[in-house]
Each structure stands twice: as structure tokens, then as C-alpha cells.
Amino acid sequence: QYAEAWESLAPFVKIGAMEDDKFADQVSDLILFATTAESIEGEQEPIKAGEKRYTTLSSYQNRLSDPQSKRILYCTDEVAQAGALTLWKSQNAEVIFAETVIDSQFLPWLEATKDQYKFQRVDAELDESLRDEKPEISDQDGETQSETIRNLIKDALNNDKVTIQVQALKGGEDAPPAMILLPEQMRRMNDMGALMDQRLPGLPDHHV
């Protein structure tokens, strides 16, 4: 029942936690996020409520294959970030959803107050687990296919602020043909500036 009511309670709980340290301590293990993880019989989390499944952050981290990892993957827009989300899910990575306006302030607040959390949006970067590292053959001029594609795109865009990377990705047919990567800290600064200026956030000047 608590999970079913969470969407209505979440804004008040999150704002209250950010404004009152004692309240934050009391609710730290009660804060839920929708997750891509499947419910497991006999396990308390993820909790199924309607069409969604919910988890606490501590349970998320307990399910990580690397117990030393602090990284928590999150998605703010299931449609706009669909390619990156699908790619991570294809490698069995769990992703939480932080889609409300308050989450743009709540996640950085959690990082600042809880040393065990480090949040990374699904479209922030591509780590080794997502790359399909295969040796490439060079042509007669010594240029690989990746370098040829990179140069073609770079010439077409003609924008020095955009970094072009050509990489083979895992995921087979589900892998997106192209992605825009927005480095986490740069994007957060851009989003904060947009919030202060009361405008919709756009792409940072520099992106990949």
C-alpha cells in the first residue's frame, strides 16, 4: 500500500528531507524510486505496485555486481533517453527513474549528504560494459572504418563544440545507431542555469 501511494507522497517526503536533517534520517530508508529491475520471488524488493516496481537506494546498491560501486544509474525521461536506457538494460544494468522536477535537486542533495551515492544519468557516458571491442582493419591509406565515419560526421556538423566518437556497441539490433552524450556535471550545471533563468534546459555547448 505504501508503494502504491508513493507517487503522491514523494514530493512532500523529498522536500521535507532536504529541509530537515532529522526528518531526512527518519525517512532515508523509506524513499522509493521506480526501477527497471524485475521482482524476485521471496525478495522484499523491488516492490511491485500496479504496473511499476519500486526500490530503495540501499537495496539497489545491494544488487550491484560490484559491491564497492557507488554508481546509481537513473533516467529522467523514458522517451527522450530511450536509446541509452535500452542499451543499459540490454547489459542487465538496473536503472531507476527520477522524472519529477524535484529530482533534479534531490539527487545532487543525496550525493552531497550521503557519501555512498553517486548518480549517473543513462546518457552521461558509455563505459566498457557497453562497448563491443573488436579489432578494426585499416584501408590502404591506414584509416579504419570508424575514423572514416567520424571524419564524415565531423565535416557534416562543422561544429568544434561537438566531440564525435565512433564505437561499436553491445546490444545487437537494440543498440541505438547514434547517441548524444551529456557529461553528468556539465549537464547538471546547464540544467541549474536553465532553472534559475526559468527556461527549458537545452543541450550544453559542449557534448559528445
Regions found by a protein language model. Name each.
Residues 1-208:
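Conserved GHKL (Bergerat-fold) ATPase module
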